[in-house]
Amino acid sequence: PCILAMGRENLPLAAKISVLNANYVKENLRDYYALPIEGICKHEFVFDGMRAEYGGSHSDASHITTLEVAKRLLDYGFHAPTIYFPLLFHESMMIEPTESESKETLDKFIDVLKKIALEARETPHLLRTAPQSTPVRRLDDVKAVKDARFTYTPEVN
């Protein structure tokens, strides 16, 4: 529906803006997050966790994980990006800003990810216990896998 609404004549412009947005975000965060692939990206790019100086050393068992970064983004009102995919890297975090995001929104996203990197270095417990501000906090992923329920059953009081 979105492509149809843009019309054939605007689709090439939307694609160019999407590529521009991805490269803008990538270049503004490269000093904070590990960038395993250099060069100009298309509409998306992948970080391999945080740079070591912000607590992202994969060889350290206490490193800040991509999951913790993604959970902390929720506290700032951003949807968590795709994480641990593609499987090419240990701490993959795929960033895919769309063509419809304003520069103001991109700048806010960049500022938040920079702030999260600084939090990881100075107050890592904020990331380890994130999200703090969502109605549901950390889910028990192991329990969810072992006790999978695929239908909703209302609780009876």
Annotated model-derived regions:
Residues C2:
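N-terminal cofactor/phosphate-binding cores enriched in small/glycine residues
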Residues A5-N157:
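Non-catalytic terminal extensions of PLP-dependent enzymes
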